[in-house]
Amino acid sequence: MGVARRLDDSRLRRLAYTRAASRLLGRTDATVGSACELLATAVDGVDGDRTVAVHARDVRSSAGVDTERAERLLGRVLVEAGYPVDLDDPDRELRALFTGDRCLLGWLVAESVRDFGTRAPTDRPFFQPGSMVSLDARAYANLAGAAPGQTILDPMCGTGGLLIEAGVAGSQVIGVDAQWKMVRGSRENLAAYLDDGFRVARGDGTRLPVPTDAVDGVVFDAPYGRQSKIANHTLDDLVEGTLREAARVAPRCVLIADRDWSETAATAGWQVDASFERRVHGSLVRHVHVLEERTG
């Protein structure tokens, strides 16, 4: 759960790990009584002809709150303020999030589209073991800047999972891979989900067939050294060389790997804007590096 200063409805619908966003009314202690007191002072009856509903959630059962009771009592506050209730098709929905010792109240603004299951790796025309799930691929594509009007490049595109999600988010996408098998498979997968706006070529990530400053963002999942062929490079040389090429063609890059490559990224000319880990299963933790062009 996080708080943002500004909300963009169209971007919210493309998010991966965020399910919904609300316009914050306020925050208080994680009790139903405190939530009702906050709501009573926050609502003013404006747009009182618009129907409402309440949805409460106890995040990971961390607050010990009876959410049905919370919905009932918060709904009573809204009725007393003059709002008609419609549980089936409300004009507005109040969200109450209880987490730990806090409660946040807000009017729902937008929900992200949860259709990732329709693009599961095993359901694509071309599949290889170890392919990234669509939910994670969308998150990393978003970090790279995937959006309408943007061009995203994956220099190690494999089966095309990252490019599919960047394309579904509205981007033009370019893929490069050293193996013809992957190039053909990626093209087949992209054609299954995107009408147009994609190109895939065989090439070397350390010598990209792309002009300087030609794309808006780069995103790639580096070989893990276990199931991936690395062609004629050592893994270290491949990752560093690809990062150098990424810095030539784009101002932003997202690198996903099974280890920390922050020092290599800095050597290749990038500034590490953020890094975090995401556990996939017991033997794999992904290291995600968000890289920005170095200034000054």
Predicted ranges, named:
Residues 84-88:
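Interaction modules related to DNA damage response and DNA replication/repair
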